[in-house]
Amino acid sequence: MRQFIVTGHDAPTTPDFSLDDIAGGAGRLDVLCRCVNSAFFLSHDIREDVRVHLVLGDEYTVRFEGSELRRLNPDERSTAALIRKALEKREEAIGHMPAESSPGVSIRRMGFETTLEEAASDATVVELHEDGDPVVQVEPPENPLFVLSDHHDFTDEEAELLAAAADERVRLGPEILHADHSITVAHNYLDTAGYSRY
């Protein structure tokens, strides 16, 4: 299982946003939507062995489960609609118990720390960092959990939690990439067994 946590610092925590303004009025929800699409889409298929956790404003986590996903289309607007539908169910999420909003999409009342702890319980936590080891020098983990931020840096508290939880600290290349591009590169690294199998 490949997992990705993406924290959205300005992401909406209510469904009161326009699907026509996800890059502005919805707190750069477009960044999170691109991450979801990069995590799941192949040319003519969906990666079923992937789970994505979107942390919205450190208040809710929307989980996408690849093996159960339906109605995910490769455009940001329809992905934002799935997130909005999940937020419409937020009152049904009791404690850490999820509320399913559509097949493969659920919402939980969990912030970054709890989401990281839960996802890390059966995964190798990989911190992507510009000062990390080159990814080509690191053996691809069997059940990786990549943790990324939106267009903002991690807060100091998030960075400390991640540093404490990380099993590996790697960099994907000489340049800093957008979160959605990092997901694509991470998939390629795993698909090719560390760039050794094509």
UniProtKB/Swiss-Prot annotation:
Organism superkingdom: Archaea
Disruption phenotype: Deletion leads to the absence of 1-methylpseudouridine at position 54 of tRNA, but does not lead to any obvious phenotype.
Keyword tRNA processing: yes
Gene: trmY
InterPro entries in the record: Alpha/beta_knot_MTases, TrmY, tRNA_m1G_MTases_N
The protein's assembly and partners: Homodimer.
Protein name: tRNA (pseudouridine(54)-N(1))-methyltransferase
UniProt-listed SUPFAM superfamilies: alpha/beta knot
Transmembrane segments: none
Binding, S-adenosyl-L-methionine: L128
Main location: cytoplasm
Keywords associated with the record: Cytoplasm, Methyltransferase, S-adenosyl-L-methionine, Transferase, tRNA processing
Entries under Pfam families matching the protein: Methyltrn_RNA_2 (PF04013)
GO MF, one annotated term: tRNA methyltransferase activity
